[in-house]
């Protein structure tokens, strides 16, 4: 499990409000009282994490909290897996991000292309992917799929029969719709796989190549990548699960390979899952977003672009473009402001900003 929160909401008015940095902040360490947060914050977070581990929610995890460019809490807890000899977790432990891939990688790439004028959210998916030509899908636009309103089903176990991008595109094209495009919000992995394929068609690069060049590399996120199954990273990666025959693949201990079976069947680089990262790297990414698309002199997107992509798109849904925003019973809890945005992942990952 990994949880990261970049806090922007006020927690109390009993102490003077700290002076914010004059320019876009670069992360530094601080104490809760430095940024007007409760003095017992760290002790409270320690207790929550330790209780969760003791109750078996996870063998370990990492939690980071920051405000005004100060990381006031970044700490690893427990171990990488349940084995007694397993390595302890720290801020550099790499986790399978699961559906955080949708926002950290795929949405970031799409946002860059839209800002550059290479991606038009109101064009149909078929105009970018002519193979996506089923009559019932002709009206599906890019805006619909990045807000999960394309009418596609949430998921299917295609990994039991199919492999690779081309086969997945063909099968998604053939799958029946769950609703009329544009009428309902259904969280769908297919939406972000299609977004990935559009990005790759526009750029002529694979998603991992493009997002590493345009986002992870410039930001210095050196531990954020797809397919990290090499000797260099293996000892830092927390195993995800033991895959049994029930999943149809029998991969054994899933360690250094993507947990999501459809992402694995596509090749490990997928728009909906497959990214690995650390709390340290995600703190940089989160601060870039809080800075309006810039970090340490590196501009990823313009503030107006970021504001547009992180705002709810419909009164009928909390969904922004790629991102989610707070709603009743959402994972944001009760204290993030209405302007916040975030996402979660199946493997226990979470980011709220």
Predicted segments, located by residue:
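Short, surface-exposed beta-strand/loop micro-motifs that present aromatic residues
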Residues: 340, 347-353
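Acidic/histidine-rich, surface-exposed loop or edge segments in extracytoplasmic proteins
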Residues: 23-33
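Short, conserved catalytic-motif segment at the N-terminal edge
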Residues: 33-95, 118-120, 167-170, 174
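Active-site SXXK
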Residues: 46-52, 63, 69-71, 95-122, ...
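Short, surface-exposed loop or secondary-structure junction motifs
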Residues: 23, 77, 81-82, 135-339
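Short, glycine/proline-biased beta-turn/loop segments that scaffold the active-site neighborhood
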Residues: 120-135, 217-219
């Amino acid at each position: 499990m990994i949880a990261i929160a970049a806090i922007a909401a006020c927690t109390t008015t009993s102490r003077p409000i700290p002076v914010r940095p004059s320019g876009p902040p670069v992360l530094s360490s601080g104490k809760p009282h430095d940024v007007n947060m409760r003095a017992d914050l760290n002790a409270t977070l320690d207790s929550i994490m330790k209780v969760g581990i003791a109750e078996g929610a996870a063998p370990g995890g990492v939690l980071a909290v920051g405000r005004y460019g100060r990381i006031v809490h970044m700490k690893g807890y427990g171990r990488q897996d349940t084995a007694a000899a397993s390595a302890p977790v720290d801020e550099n432990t790499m986790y399978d991000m699961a559906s955080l891939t949708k926002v950290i990688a795929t949405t970031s790439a799409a946002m860059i292309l839209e800002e550059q004028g290479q991606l038009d959210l109101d064009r149909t998916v078929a105009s970018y992917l002519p193979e996506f030509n089923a009559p019932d899908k002709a009206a599906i636009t890019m805006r619909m799929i990045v807000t999960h309103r394309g009418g596609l089903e949430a998921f299917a176990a295609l990994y039991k029969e199919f492999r690779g991008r081309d086969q997945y595109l063909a099968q998604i094209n053939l799958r029946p719709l769950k609703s009329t495009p544009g009428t309902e919000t259904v969280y769908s992995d297919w939406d972000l796989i299609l977004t990935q394929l559009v990005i790759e068609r526009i750029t002529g690069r694979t998603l991992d190549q493009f997002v590493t060049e345009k986002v992870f590399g410039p930001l210095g996120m050196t531990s954020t990548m797809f397919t990290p199954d090499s000797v260099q990273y293996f000892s830092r990666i927390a195993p995800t699960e033991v895959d049994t025959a029930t999943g149809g693949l029998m991969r054994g201990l899933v360690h250094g390979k993507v947990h999501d079976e459809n992402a694995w069947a596509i090749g490990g680089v997928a728009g909906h899952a497959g990214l690995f990262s650390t709390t340290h790297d995600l703190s940089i990414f989160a601060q870039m977003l809080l800075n309006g698309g810039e970090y340490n002199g590196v501009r990823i997107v313009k503030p107006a672009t970021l504001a547009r992509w992180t705002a709810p798109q419909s009164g009928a849904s909390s969904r922004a473009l790629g991102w989610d925003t707070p709603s009743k019973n959402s994972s944001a809890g009760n204290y993030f402001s209405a302007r916040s945005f975030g996402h979660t992942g199946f493997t226990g990952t979470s980011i709220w900003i």
